[in-house]
């Protein structure tokens, strides 16, 4: 069963190549259906879900190791906030698993891996580059904000001296960073919530996919906002134990 929020099918058109879908109206009930469908797919193919999730976890650990090795522990703050921006690209394999389950196609490692690697000749690398550039730009912006507000305090290790974040400057910095970070997240959400599944499902160019994705968001703003909040809550629940 496809995700009724993000797949091209829910935008009102049948599956066919080279057709950019027009957005259809959806309701918040689609969110519950999407979560139920995702859980159902995970139960049917848990090994695939765990493997692709492991890549995401290992990526986070790698960024943490880089920050600690460089002696720049404060990098962990923008990394924790910005790393989820890479999640849409990390989900490519999961989209393919769900598509195969829906279509009744064979589900084995070679076939899934083959499809994922074959994306190098389509629009996925372009979307990945956009996502990566946004992540890198976010890290740069976060670094700039930190330097502007903390000044010479930037030499302080915020992981061992968190009290500097509770000062007037620290709280203002966190507030501004949160607002700007939310802007990055909103832009990326608008681009990928429909765009990424669309370029996987059909032969469309990146610009058309992004435009169609934003059209779907603007056609259903409340539903998409609710969906984004659900994603954020699940994300924070995953980060909280850290």
Indicate where each model-derived feature is located:
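Hydrophobic alpha-helical membrane segments
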Residues: 1-242
């Amino acid at each position: 069963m496809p995700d009724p929020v993000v797949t091209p099918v829910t935008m009102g058109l049948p599956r066919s190549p080279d057709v950019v879908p027009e957005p259809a109206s959806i309701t918040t009930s689609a969110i519950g259906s999407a979560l139920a469908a995702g859980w159902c797919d995970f139960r049917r193919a848990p090994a695939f879900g765990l493997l692709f999730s492991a890549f995401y976890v290992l990526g986070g650990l790698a960024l943490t190791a880089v920050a600690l090795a460089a002696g720049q522990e404060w990098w962990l703050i923008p990394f924790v906030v910005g790393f989820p921006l890479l999640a849409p690209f990390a989900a490519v394999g999961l989209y393919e698993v769900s598509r195969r389950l829906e279509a009744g196609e064979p589900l084995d490692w070679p076939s899934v891996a083959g499809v994922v690697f074959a994306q190098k000749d389509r629009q996925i690398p372009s979307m990945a580059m956009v996502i990566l550039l946004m992540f890198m730009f976010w890290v740069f912006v976060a670094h700039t904000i930190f330097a502007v507000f903390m000044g010479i305090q930037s030499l302080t290790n915020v992981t061992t001296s968190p009290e500097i974040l509770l000062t007037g400057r620290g709280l203002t910095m966190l507030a501004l960073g949160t607002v700007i970070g939310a802007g990055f997240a909103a832009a990326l959400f608008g681009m990928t919530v429909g765009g990424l599944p669309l370029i996987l499902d059909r032969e469309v160019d990146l610009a058309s996919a992004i435009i169609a994705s934003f059209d779907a968001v603007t056609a259903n703003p409340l539903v998409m906002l609710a969906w984004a909040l659900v994603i954020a809550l699940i994300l924070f629940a995953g980060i909280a134990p850290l």
